[in-house]
Structures are given as C-alpha cells and as structure tokens.
Amino acid sequence: MTDFLPFSRPTMGDEEIAAVAEVLRSGWITTGPKCQQLEQAFCQQFGCQQAIAVSSATGGMHVTLMALGIGPGDEVITPSQTWVSTVNIITLLGAEPVMVDVDRHTLMVRSQDIEAAITPKTKAIIPVHYAGAPADLDALRALSERYGIPLIEDAAHAVGTQYRGEWIGARGTAIFSFHAIKNITCAEGGMVVTDDEALAERIRSLKFHGLGVDAFDRQLQGRKPQAEVVTPGFKYNLADINAAIALVQLDKLPAINARRQQLAARYLTQLHSLPLQPLAVPDYPHLHAWHLFMVRVDETQCGISRDDLMAALQTHGIGTGLHFRAVHTQKYYRERYPHLHLPETEWNSASLMTLPLFPDMQDSDVDRVVAALTSILESVRD
C-alpha cells in the first residue's frame, strides 16, 4: 500500500531533538536565553533592526495593532484573501476591517484597491506576502508615506523571501509565523520585526502582561523584581523550548527554501499540459520562498470541481489544502457584510487548491501527484 502523502510536513532532525534536550537539562524552559538568541539571529540573518519573539503570528498581530493604538472607530485595510486571524483581531479590537480585492493571478493586494479604500478613519494597511512571494512593497510603501498610514506586513508565508534584493523584514514592520506547516517551525511561534524602536518597546511590554521585563530579564539584568504594569497586556511570549527548535530551523532555512524551489520548479514543468492554473509569480524582481504550491481548479476547464478533485486525490493517498477560503465568505463576516463583493477573491476562494510541498518530499512524490492529477482529469473528460 502506498504511503499517504500529506500536503505539508515539518522537517525535523536530530539537531532539533538535541536543542530541546539542552533546554530541558538547563532548568530554564520558558522565555530565556534561547529566545534572546533567536531574536538576535533573526536580525542578523534578515537585517532587521528589532525582533520580538511571540507565541504565534496571531499574537504578534494582536499586540502590534494594539501598540499602534488601533481600536473602536478605526479602520484597517487588508485583503479578504487571507487567514482569518488578521480580520478577527481587527474586529476584536473594535475596529472595522476594510476588506479589499486581490490580483486574480498572484493573489497579491493591489495598491489601487487599497488607495480607493482609504478614508480619514484608516489607521493601518496590512498586505499579505502570499504563498512565499512578496507583495509589491514599493507601491505599498509609497501609499503608506503619502497618507501617513502605518504599513504592517503579514509575512507569515515569507520567511526567506526577498523583494528587489532585500529580505522581507529588513525594513518597516512585518510579522512572521513559525506554525507547524511554515518554512521554519517550532510547532507554534512567531516573530514581529520592526525598525521603529518605540513600537518595538510597546510590543515587548504588551506581549508579556504589560510589564517592561520578563522573568528572565529580572533574574539576569538586576532589575527590580516588583516590575510594574505599564498598560494591561497579554501572555504571548515564546518559550525557550520552542525558540531552541526555531534556532536550528533558521540555520537550515537556506537549504529548506532551496529544496522547496526545486520541487516547485518540477511541479511547474510537469503541470504545464494540464488545465490547472498555478498561481502566477510576480513580475518584479524577487526571491520566492515557495511556502505553498497552489493551483486553481476551474470546473469549466477541468470538468471537475475543486472539492471533488481534492476528494479524488485523497483516494490516491494524496493530501491537499485550501489556503484560504475568503474571510468575507465565512458565516460571521458574510452576515456582517452581506453586500461585500470581491470578484477576484471569490473566484480564487472557490477554486484554490494547495498541493503537497515540503522539503523532505522526493522528486518521485511530485511525479506521483502529477500522475494522479493527470489520471483524474483524463477520467472526467472521457
């Protein structure tokens, strides 16, 4: 029987196991030296000015928007073609999410759509670097500067991505994810990076109860143990067990992303003759991290719906994903914004399918996926 091929699987080895064992033996397993080392290594690798490790990218988004003072009466512009957490956070803060359409072929938010949505209430713009490719930052930064609106990059898919020769995160404010399926992972975790020192300090406080320091800081830096709450905060700090794994993964990132690029290139070559539509890569200079390999299933061209094709692949022992169902089409937001219509987003939301892509895949795994797709699509055309 052929083994099941998931759409993603973390790449772990003896180095990660040894790193966790080292932390367990140290006696300090929560936020501590490994977390500090991870922040420093992230800055060194990507040219960031400030890096704040957090327990998830969602938590990072929460404290970043809070640090910007976003709340009731404010508006935040972001695409609907994104993971729900961003829009959830905006909503939970009492602000209004202003969801805009994306480019049909790349899924990148377009500067003209953002500009059309700007009002005097707009307090932040959150573009998404999608599937490992970067959004067009020159155009987005120009908007941010022209209107004086903070730009917060959702870089959950973009660790190791470059835009015009510059690492994502080297400038401005960006939020990365270390979730289990991301290019580097520590099971759960994230990193907020920024070149705004004052913003970084507010985020550091908010991610740990609103205190200015954490327990490790108080122990080693000689600060008063009676640390005071500056403003009410949360518990979004990253534990050293997770940070130790992330440090090893960060060191492996160049090899991880290189393998992802090889697998993606093999897919693109072999899928050329099938009626599936892979995402287009942006035409501006960039380095793609290939977090996800996505195709669009147009039922009129393929003779089968996206959902039925996913089910058929499952019978072949092949897993798939859906990244993502548009936020405004989901029950809560559909009822709250019944008249919102985003045609490019809605077409993609109904047709997107993520194929298996992870560094431990063999070339033969790509061949197997393409062979299964070919067989299924030929059978429905007969």
Curated annotation (Swiss-Prot):
Entries under SUPFAM superfamilies matching the protein: PLP-dependent transferases
Keywords for the protein's UniProt record, in alphabetical order: Aminotransferase, Antibiotic resistance, Lipid A biosynthesis, Lipid biosynthesis, Lipid metabolism, Lipopolysaccharide biosynthesis, Pyridoxal phosphate, Transferase
CDD domains: AHBA_syn
Catalytically driven reaction(s): UDP-4-amino-4-deoxy-beta-L-arabinose + 2-oxoglutarate = UDP-beta-L-threo-pentopyranos-4-ulose + L-glutamate
One MF annotation (Gene Ontology) recorded for this entry: UDP-4-amino-4-deoxy-L-arabinose aminotransferase
Cofactors (names): pyridoxal 5'-phosphate
Enzyme class per UniProt: transferase
EC number in record: 2.6.1.87
This protein's pathway: Nucleotide-sugar biosynthesis; UDP-4-deoxy-4-formamido-beta-L-arabinose biosynthesis; UDP-4-deoxy-4-formamido-beta-L-arabinose from UDP-alpha-D-glucuronate: step 2/3; Bacterial outer membrane biogenesis; lipopolysaccharide biosynthesis
InterPro entries in the record: ArnB_NH2Trfase, DegT/StrS_aminotransferase, PyrdxlP-dep_Trfase, PyrdxlP-dep_Trfase_major, PyrdxlP-dep_Trfase_small
UniProt keyword annotation of Transferase present: yes
Known function: Catalyzes the conversion of UDP-4-keto-arabinose (UDP-Ara4O) to UDP-4-amino-4-deoxy-L-arabinose (UDP-L-Ara4N). The modified arabinose is attached to lipid A and is required for resistance to polymyxin and cationic antimicrobial peptides.
Family: Belongs to the DegT/DnrJ/EryC1 family. ArnB subfamily.
Record PANTHER family: TRANSAMINASE, UDP-4-AMINO-4-DEOXY-L-ARABINOSE--OXOGLUTARATE AMINOTRANSFERASE
Complex formation: Homodimer.
Name of this chain's protein: UDP-4-amino-4-deoxy-L-arabinose--oxoglutarate aminotransferase
Classification of source organism: Bacteria, Pseudomonadati, Pseudomonadota, Gammaproteobacteria, Enterobacterales
Gene: arnB
